[in-house]
Amino acid sequence: FVVLGMQAQQHVMTVDVSKPTARINPAMYGIFFEDINFGADGGLYAELVKNRSFEFPQPLVGWIPFGEVTVQDERPCFDRNPHYVRITNDGCLLRAGLDNEGYRGIGLKKGEDYRFSAYVRTPDTKPMKLSVELVNSNGENLLKKELEVKGSEWQKLTAVLKAPFTDVRSRLRVVLQTEGTVDMDHISLFPVNTWKKRENGLRADLVQALYDLNPGVFRFPGGCIIEGNSLATRYQWKNSVGPVENRPLNENRWNYTFKHKAFPDYFQSYGLGFYEYFLLSEDLGAEPLPVLSCGLSCQYESNEVVPLGELG
């Protein structure tokens, strides 16, 4: 046998970047966002409270009530999100209220400010006293702020809380201190330091990461999530705009893709809706590419189709 060794030939390519030969369309490179694995609620959308409007099919998912806490829907604050909680302190129990666990925990950073808000009312003639607390993973409430509730009409309460600790599994706690009753809805906690400091804003660190990619096009809000598991749960963009408190909850296409992988707490609050997506496109300097429902549900889950004559 004869083995012939051949030395690999070397080639040199010289590129003169000062003389571009063809223009590359900036829209050839971009990013595609879809709410998978808590990508929106619990991710890019900076809201820290899960199920803030008590509209999940099991209305207290994400909440740990203590004392007398019930879910009501009479004379609601928001017609498309009618459920709220009624907290009653009868004077016999040590306390009455509820904790929110967030999205696998509420991540807080020491020294950072967080904006609490809620819609409240009381049937009692005297003012009610609420305490809003930040509780660490050891169960210690290291920050407590008291707020006053008075009047039988819905009103919005707000407060800024400065976190005294860093903990990725914190909780938000609301306690009715006064003997009496208080109704609460749309209980919310946002970092003040969102992207561009906007209320109802996005996580600054995640948007910065997207911005640094310098995308030419931004596609949203997804692919399969648009179809929904059925036509009833398809993404309808008109429900994702308007006052954030009254945007109706929708099921997430990815909450039970497989029978052995069900996520009963995976829904879409629409707090991150079409208005916010278009605004984000402007911030990124990217062309917006919205995806709309064509009247076809996910064909893996159902075979529902809107008749062609009914599309509009």
Q: Where in the sequence are the language-model features?
A:
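Residue-level signal for the nucleotide or nucleotide-sugar donor/cofactor binding architecture
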Residues: L272
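Bacterial Sec-dependent N-terminal signal peptides
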Residues: F1-Q10
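Extracellular and organelle-lumenal recognition/adhesion modules and their flexible linkers in secreted
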Residues: Q9-S269, E282-V291, S302-L311
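Alpha-helical bundle segments that constitute or directly flank the non-heme di-iron/ferroxidase center
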Residues: F278
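Conserved radical SAM core fold
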Residues: G295-C298
